[in-house]
């Protein structure tokens, strides 16, 4: 019941009852937003309604790259970076939809399959380039890891929508974290 109340306020993530202090408190363990402004807006609203909130920012440094390749290869590499952003954004929106609109596991899996198909369409062309070390190797490694995680959540068996929603949230945070680590490594 408390989880539903918190979700109606805009909370998402892993909600659990904590009685360690002697009183029962409900905590949201993780929630992701596409911008700091969105997170701050939710934080301010929840705080004004008496909900204890802490906000942490996940970011990566801006990186500049010098690529020497033909125009189509450069477009594919730029598309790869955009694909990570789109997957992170798409999963963020999907997580909110699953929780807010009470979608079924099957509906959530279809959304994940669409995100995976788009991700594949933009990143698979990079596999045809010769040499998979350096920048290309980093991009392909992150793609492989994130693709495997998306495929796992899309193909998994879940006991409930809560289990599936938790898996989606984990995948969303995993891909954002893996992408940030890749960009940080490439930025050197």
Feature map (PLM): residue ranges:
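Intrinsic-disorder-associated interaction segments
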Residues: 70-73, 77, 105, 168, ...
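Amphipathic, charged alpha-helical scaffolds that flank and support histidine-based chemistry
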Residues: 70, 99, 160-161
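Solvent-exposed beta-strand motifs enriched in subsets of small alpha/beta binding domains
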Residues: 1-69
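Alpha-helical segments in soluble extracytoplasmic regions
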Residues: 73, 80-149
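Extracytoplasmic/luminal low-complexity segments enriched in Pro/Gly and acidic/polar residues
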Residues: 120-188
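A broad "ordered helical/assembly scaffold" signature
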Residues: 4, 29, 44, 74-85, ...
């Amino acid at each position: 019941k408390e989880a539903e109340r918190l979700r109606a306020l805009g909370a998402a993530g892993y909600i659990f009852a904590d009685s360690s202090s002697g009183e029962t408190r409900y905590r949201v363990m993780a929630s992701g937003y596409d911008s700091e402004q969105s997170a701050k807006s939710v934080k301010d609203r929840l705080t004004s309604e008496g909900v204890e909130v802490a906000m942490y920012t996940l970011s990566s440094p801006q990186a500049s790259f010098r690529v020497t390749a033909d125009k189509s290869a450069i477009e594919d590499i730029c598309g790869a970076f955009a694909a990570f952003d789109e997957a992170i954004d798409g999963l963020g929106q999907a997580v909110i939809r699953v929780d807010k609109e009470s979608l079924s596991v099957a509906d959530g899996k279809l959304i994940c399959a669409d995100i995976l198909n788009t991700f594949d369409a933009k990143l698979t062309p990079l596999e045809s380039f010769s040499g998979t070390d350096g920048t290309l190797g980093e991009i392909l490694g992150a793609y492989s890891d994130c693709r495997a995680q998306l495929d796992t959540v899309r193909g998994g068996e879940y006991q409930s929508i809560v289990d599936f929603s938790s898996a989606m949230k984990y995948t969303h945070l995993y891909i954002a974290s893996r992408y940030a680590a890749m960009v940080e490594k490439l930025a050197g």
